[in-house]
Amino acid sequence: MNIKDALALVVNGKDLSVEQMTDVMREVMTGKATDAQRGAFLVALRIKSETLDEITGAAKVMRELATKVVVNADNLVDTCGTGGDGANLFNVSTASAFVVAAAGGHVAKHGNRSVSSSTGSADVLEAAGVNLQMPADQVARAIETIGVGFMFAPAHHSAMKHAIGPRKELGLRTIFNMLGPMTNPAGVKNQVIGVFTKALCRPMAEVLGRLGSEHVLVVHSEDGLDELSIAAPSHVAEYHKGNVTEYTLSPADVGIEMQSLEGLGVATAEESLALINGAFAGSDEPAAQKAAAIIALNAGAAIYVSGLATSFKDGVAMAEDALATGAAREKLKELVEFSAL
């Protein structure tokens, strides 16, 4: 199916099959469609609401066209979010990656520069001194030897260049906001994904199950974060062993004290890095203590889905240990040094 035929269906409220969506996305991602067609298609899909089949088909094409990172490691996991929650918190999922590595996991962190927030994962890692342009084989070695590596999305999804213009000009959330976390170049099968609305939790968990994932938590907090929050309960859709289970999780359920988010907002990558460094150093500043708590909560989730812990609560305890010993700080230092080689 070509994009013109697909547009005719979608604008009339008709859904596309997985096969039809893969045909159209290949036109979008290979430059065959015009900017006008790409923009119209993205908006029409958004207005109609994307179905599981459409999201699945689009994700398949992005995965197919990605520059792969082949990693030989157990417990491979990713921590990421869709962004777009408007909270402007420091980079929680990025910080969590180093804690998971310090606990013995292997994190294939996939991310980009900021689109809607103050700072994206790439921005804060660059501020820390990480070389974002590492080739795929070096990223794989980092994951295997250090336990964490960063895959800069534009370097691995070059086909995205065909969608950048329309996305920027539209200024709207589109299907691409969902696709980023579902198209990890290392093919991770265990993930913690934060989303900007509760309505996405179950659909994304179901799509990832269709795409071969093993253990996934898709989360959205009641105070609006695309993370697990320390200030409110969070909605969780957990995919594991072929089933999706939905539940509400309070920080206290896994041993984290409920507390406000005051002091965790940032305006720049440097401010985000300062909070992360404070948390990693065990600072007794109130903001650093809160940062450590929300990092431990989210890292604990990733440790759990990676298989390193048998329960979410045990994962959080392992994350707290990794922070307390300074091991997480060492992992960040190791990645900075390794990326400069």
Curated annotation (Swiss-Prot):
<comment type="pathway">
    <text>Amino-acid biosynthesis; L-tryptophan biosynthesis; L-tryptophan from chorismate: step 2/5.</text>
</comment>
<feature type="binding site">
    <location>
        <begin position="91"/>
        <end position="94"/>
    </location>
    <ligand>
        <name>5-phospho-alpha-D-ribose 1-diphosphate</name>
    </ligand>
</feature>
<keyword id="KW-0822">Tryptophan biosynthesis</keyword>
<feature type="binding site">
    <location>
        <position position="167"/>
    </location>
    <ligand>
        <name>anthranilate 2</name>
    </ligand>
</feature>
<feature type="binding site">
    <location>
        <position position="227"/>
    </location>
    <ligand>
        <name>Mg(2+) 2</name>
    </ligand>
</feature>
<keyword id="KW-0328">Glycosyltransferase</keyword>
<dbReference type="InterPro" id="IPR005940">
    <property type="entry name" value="Anthranilate_Pribosyl_Tfrase"/>
</dbReference>
<protein>
    <recommendedName>
        <fullName>Anthranilate phosphoribosyltransferase</fullName>
        <ecNumber>2.4.2.18</ecNumber>
    </recommendedName>
</protein>
<keyword id="KW-0028">Amino-acid biosynthesis</keyword>
<dbReference type="GO" id="GO:0005829">
    <property type="term" value="C:cytosol"/>
</dbReference>
<feature type="binding site">
    <location>
        <begin position="109"/>
        <end position="117"/>
    </location>
    <ligand>
        <name>5-phospho-alpha-D-ribose 1-diphosphate</name>
    </ligand>
</feature>
<dbReference type="Pfam" id="PF00591">
    <property type="entry name" value="Glycos_transf_3"/>
</dbReference>
<dbReference type="InterPro" id="IPR036320">
    <property type="entry name" value="Glycosyl_Trfase_fam3_N_dom_sf"/>
</dbReference>
<feature type="binding site">
    <location>
        <begin position="84"/>
        <end position="85"/>
    </location>
    <ligand>
        <name>5-phospho-alpha-D-ribose 1-diphosphate</name>
    </ligand>
</feature>
<keyword id="KW-0808">Transferase</keyword>
<dbReference type="GO" id="GO:0004048">
    <property type="term" value="F:anthranilate phosphoribosyltransferase activity"/>
</dbReference>
<dbReference type="InterPro" id="IPR000312">
    <property type="entry name" value="Glycosyl_Trfase_fam3"/>
</dbReference>
<dbReference type="GO" id="GO:0000162">
    <property type="term" value="P:L-tryptophan biosynthetic process"/>
</dbReference>
<keyword id="KW-0057">Aromatic amino acid biosynthesis</keyword>
<dbReference type="GO" id="GO:0000287">
    <property type="term" value="F:magnesium ion binding"/>
</dbReference>
<keyword id="KW-0479">Metal-binding</keyword>
<feature type="binding site">
    <location>
        <position position="93"/>
    </location>
    <ligand>
        <name>Mg(2+) 1</name>
    </ligand>
</feature>
<comment type="similarity">
    <text>Belongs to the anthranilate phosphoribosyltransferase family.</text>
</comment>
<dbReference type="InterPro" id="IPR017459">
    <property type="entry name" value="Glycosyl_Trfase_fam3_N_dom"/>
</dbReference>
<feature type="binding site">
    <location>
        <position position="81"/>
    </location>
    <ligand>
        <name>5-phospho-alpha-D-ribose 1-diphosphate</name>
    </ligand>
</feature>
<dbReference type="InterPro" id="IPR035902">
    <property type="entry name" value="Nuc_phospho_transferase"/>
</dbReference>
<keyword id="KW-0460">Magnesium</keyword>
<feature type="binding site">
    <location>
        <position position="81"/>
    </location>
    <ligand>
        <name>anthranilate 1</name>
    </ligand>
</feature>
<comment type="function">
    <text>Catalyzes the transfer of the phosphoribosyl group of 5-phosphorylribose-1-pyrophosphate (PRPP) to anthranilate to yield N-(5'-phosphoribosyl)-anthranilate (PRA).</text>
</comment>
<feature type="binding site">
    <location>
        <position position="121"/>
    </location>
    <ligand>
        <name>5-phospho-alpha-D-ribose 1-diphosphate</name>
    </ligand>
</feature>
<feature type="binding site">
    <location>
        <position position="226"/>
    </location>
    <ligand>
        <name>Mg(2+) 2</name>
    </ligand>
</feature>
<dbReference type="Pfam" id="PF02885">
    <property type="entry name" value="Glycos_trans_3N"/>
</dbReference>
<feature type="binding site">
    <location>
        <position position="227"/>
    </location>
    <ligand>
        <name>Mg(2+) 1</name>
    </ligand>
</feature>
<comment type="subunit">
    <text>Homodimer.</text>
</comment>
<feature type="binding site">
    <location>
        <position position="112"/>
    </location>
    <ligand>
        <name>anthranilate 1</name>
    </ligand>
</feature>
